Structure formats: structure tokens, C-alpha cells
A protein has these predicted regions:
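Tryptophan-centric aromatic hotspots in well-structured domains and transmembrane helices
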Residues: 70-72
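Short S/T/G/P-rich N-terminal loop/turn motif that feeds into the first structured element of a domain
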Residues: 1-63, 79, 103-155
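An amphipathic, aromatic/His-enriched active-site/gating alpha helix that lines ligand/cofactor pockets
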Residues: 74-107
Length: 155
């Protein structure tokens, strides 16, 4: 069973970091041969990254149609994405070959955000270890850290 943290907490992370949002959209569900390989590729990549702390991958949250990833730097993210010996690059080239001219069958997207040290805030209450707090360190949201403004000013 997941442990719920009943008190208010926030995340604490040293230095800059990257938030990477990635997802897919099945536009033609009757064509699983187009979208199923895309769907199946991500869990393998996550397992691979979790086994390699030196990759710079800090953690992730999964939701339907969306995966939020936390990275130490953009350079770490890019190095993983372009490494032909890791799972992403072969999956990406296979995706492009498989789709060919039928790009509308399945959609993929991503957004990358560089976050400067101290330029973030978050709070969790009545939650399991989650989000940035799960990918970094969790601290009590007390004193200056009780409000969003206080958390941002504390950075």
C-alpha cells in the first residue's frame, strides 16, 4: 500500500533542473500496429533510466496520455535521447519508419522546460511521495515555506 504523507511538504532540489513533458495520442485506434509499439516503448525506457542514475534522470510521474520527467539538465536528457546504445534512439527511428506517410495515426509530443535554481514552488498535502518531491528531496512546508510566495522567495 502507498504511504500517504498527511502533513504539508514541498520539494527541495539543488541547482538547475529540467522538466520534460511527453505524451502520445491515439488518433486511429483501429490501427494498433501503428500506435502499440509507441505505447510499449516508454516503460522500457523508464526502467532503463531508473537503473542508470548517472543518466541524469531524476524521476517521473505517469498519467493517461502524459509522462512528466525530471532531469538534472537538458544535456543529460539530450545525451540519452541521441544515444544509439540506449532504448530511445532505436524506438524513435523505428517510429519514423513505421509511420511513413501515415503521420496522423498516432501523435506524439513533448515540451522541455529548464528550471533555474530556486525558480519553482510546489506543495503536497495528503499525498504519497509525488512529483518533484519524489524526484528530489522532501522538506516540511513550514515557516517561509508555508505559502507559494514564500517558497518562491526562499529560492
Amino acid at each position: 500500500m502507498v504511504q500517504i504523507i498527511a502533513r504539508r511538504v514541498t520539494a527541495s532540489i539543488e541547482g538547475d533542473f529540467v522538466v520534460f513533458l511527453i505524451g502520445m495520442r491515439i488518433n486511429k485506434p483501429w490501427k494498433p500496429h501503428k500506435w502499440l509499439p509507441v505505447f510499449m516503448a516508454m516503460p522500457k525506457m523508464i526502467r532503463e533510466l531508473e537503473r542508470r542514475p548517472e543518466s541524469g534522470f531524476l524521476g517521473h510521474i505517469a498519467a493517461p496520455g502524459l509522462l512528466v520527467q525530471y532531469w538534472r539538465s537538458f544535456e543529460h536528457l539530450e545525451a540519452y535521447a541521441r544515444d544509439p546504445d540506449q532504448s530511445h534512439w532505436p524506438a524513435w527511428t523505428d517510429f519514423n519508419k513505421r509511420l511513413g506517410k501515415s503521420r496522423g495515426d498516432v501523435g506524439i509530443w513533448h515540451e522541455t522546460y529548464r528550471v533555474r535554481a530556486g525558480e519553482y514552488e510546489c506543495v503536497y498535502s495528503g499525498m504519497p511521495l509525488y512529483g518533484l518531491a519524489r524526484a528530489s528531496s522532501m522538506v516540511e512546508a513550514v515557516g517561509q515555506l508555508e505559502s507559494a510566495r514564500g517558497r518562491l522567495n526562499a529560492g
